[in-house]
Amino acid sequence: MMSMDFEDFPVESAHRILTPRPTVMVTTVDEEGNINAAPFSFTMPVSIDPPVVAFASAPDHHTARNIESTHEFVINITPADIIERMWVTARDIPAGENELEAAGLAWTSSRRVKPPRIVEAPGHLECELLRMFEVGDHNLITGSVVSASVRSGAVKEGLLDVESVKPVLHVGGNKFVVGDHVRHVE
């Protein structure tokens, strides 16, 4: 057996080893219809049939509170060409103020839910709340995908074309990488 030296790593920072992670912008609306948008990297698909996605949010964030009251959200894929504008949506903007407007991002109506889709995003998953679980200091929010849309050319051979979309991946804090090449393994 081979011997290797490993350093201890703080358990409370374990999430910092699971990087980079896809970064999406989640759009919601409050009960008055005010638009909210925020970036999230604790995201994942959790079921193919039926299609279900999940992300984690601090329970006091506007996103989690809006979903709890309206039961709808949209996951918007973040391409590298809007990374600076995405970062604006991470700011602590007061409830009721539109983060998309503050970031200079455009939006359009969704097909099946009230929260809007971000025009600059190459893909969108419109979701209805399935369940929200308290997990430590976050809520795990699961949503049934009720509609999906992609920009023309954003999908190649049934997969997101990372070479053209250049999706944003979160390393930690304000550090990101861009997923812009594909490596095939055999």
UniProtKB/Swiss-Prot annotation:
This is Protein MTH_152. The keyword Flavoprotein applies. Pfam families: Flavin_Reduct. It comes from Methanothermobacter thermautotrophicus (strain ATCC 29096 / DSM 1053 / JCM 10044 / NBRC 100330 / Delta H). InterPro entries: Flavin_Rdtase-like_dom, Split_barrel_FMN-bd. Keywords: Flavoprotein, FMN. Transmembrane segments: none annotated. One of its GO terms (molecular function) is FMN binding. The keyword Flavoprotein applies. Homodimer. It comes from the Archaea. Coiled coil: none annotated. Gene3D superfamilies: Electron Transport, Fmn-binding Protein, Chain A. Its cofactor is FMN. Belongs to the flavoredoxin family.
